[in-house]
């Protein structure tokens, strides 16, 4: 039997008297890929921060055995020297530096006298990229010239340059296209063949199944199960993660669909850096009361820019006529949209959704503070009462509402941003990638909420890159391709192939869809 490369035993980590990890065990062998699964807030990232030295030895209880000896790392530097490398969900690259400079950051090759040996670094960086089978990256170019997919691969090259024996990948595909994900999974398989162990953290269970040998599930800070991947089904993994059986991930509920309530006409957006280039070109669509409208398309198609323009949040020049209940609106900024009954939960919650310096509660009430103001003062008791009520209603899990929102899991941050928008009582709610980076349990709760809102007569626009999600939730689907409307389909027998075909080619399957009700 192969000797373990790393063993964690009885790991306990406490924050303010609350156990975030409660006696967790984890073992991994050379060349093995372990999928670490669990809901947001289950303790996955905390466990990996213990392993990678972010939380140094002495700040947690238990033991880590590395290559047969106790590991007592005082810092990330110590674990990296040992060969344990973590690639975080938020990449740690310096955009202005070259690819090679990023790969060698902190481990630079120098000439006598201490000057940088750029020629040697460029050569070695090119070798690393070739070893990984990565093409299309020039080691001398700044990292900011490359998209998220290439940057993820640069991070892996950086890890290999540090002679990684154990590579921890935390949600590595959250911002990648389908083709980039395929390249990533091939690289993980190649690393396994070389004897590099991997811990793969992802909510995308198809990826976990594709590359992982073993699945380890944690729930509420406790180890639930470790089983071979071949013995598990997706439904079984979900059940272990959430502690209950979810038979239908998309809990469709009948909801009546009324007359047209909202129209966006001739929406056009110009590129921020190149004002001659159109990111969105003359897109028009209508939305009915109680309707769930999915918006699909390839990455970079202009879906987010379309929604930002409607909401008054597009950073560049945009043109649009927005009509609510037959009345044209003047939307110059998001505050105008909110006052008119339009709410939006943005794609990038960390940059445009949450305010990291504020508490969970203050993030929730940020858009409606005027409700609690009297004579220039805030009625804190009334505000706190609303916060408690709304957090309970949407199952926003936090030890206390006055904790920093930055301390919450991604799923709970998303629900807090959603709660804030719902407090504005929108008639139309735009959700841009509402389940990105959240676990299966949180996704299910968000889907249930979407159907509940539709039942109450709210109209929903949901942008998503996950086609099963679009098909499972939507009454109607818009397809955007290269900034243009490529299709407007009733979701009745619609397939992923139909959507992709429309995204690639301007094919109109149902030019004038009408929907009376959804079941």
Curated annotation (Swiss-Prot):
Catalysed reactions, semicolon-separated: D-xylose(out) + ATP + H2O = D-xylose(in) + ADP + phosphate + H(+)
Top EC group: translocase
Entry function: Part of the ABC transporter complex XylFGH involved in xylose import. Responsible for energy coupling to the transport system.
Family of the protein in this entry: Belongs to the ABC transporter superfamily. Xylose importer (TC 3.A.1.2.4) family.
Cellular component, GO annotation: plasma membrane
Major localization listed first in the record, in broad terms: membrane
Protein name: Xylose import ATP-binding protein XylG
